[in-house]
Design a protein with these regions (language model features):
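Active-site-proximal beta-strand elements of phosphoester/diester hydrolases
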Residues: 4-16, 102, 114-115
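Cys-nucleophile CN-hydrolase/nitrilase-fold catalytic domain and related Cys-dependent amidase chemistry
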Residues: 18-19, 27-112
């Protein structure tokens, strides 16, 4: 077992759409992995601009399911390809009218370990 683990933390300015934020984040994940990070943490609500100060229903469209959502799906591919664990906080749609500020934990084999 290794005596230490390198952790990479990524903080970026947010774009207007979740897809744009994922596209912006993926190269930084690759960069962190290339520098030896085995665990990579993203900023809170990485797929959106931070809006949690208010409860505005117009933001509910930005939520996505953890297990099947497009953002986690793309990150899972990257985690598997790079052999890294990714902690990805995002706005989760967890059912009808149930939303959470959640972090998905994606293992180095691309599986979602939990949230």
């Amino acid at each position: 077992m290794a005596d230490s683990v390198r952790v990479g933390l990524i903080q970026l300015t947010a774009e207007d759409t979740p897809a744009a934020n994922v596209r912006k984040t993926l190269p930084r994940i690759e960069e962190a992995a290339a520098k030896g990070a085995k665990i990579i943490g993203l900023q809170e609500m990485f797929t959106t601009k931070y809006f949690c100060i208010t409860q505005d229903p117009k933001n509910f469209d930005l939520a996505e399911p953890i297990e099947t959502g497009p953002s986690v799906t793309e990150l899972a591919k990257a985690a598997k390809r790079l052999g890294v664990v990714i902690v990805a906080p995002l706005f989760e749609a967890r059912g009808s009218e149930v939303y959470h500020n959640t972090a998905a934990v994606i293992d180095a084999d691309g599986t979602v370990l939990g949230k």
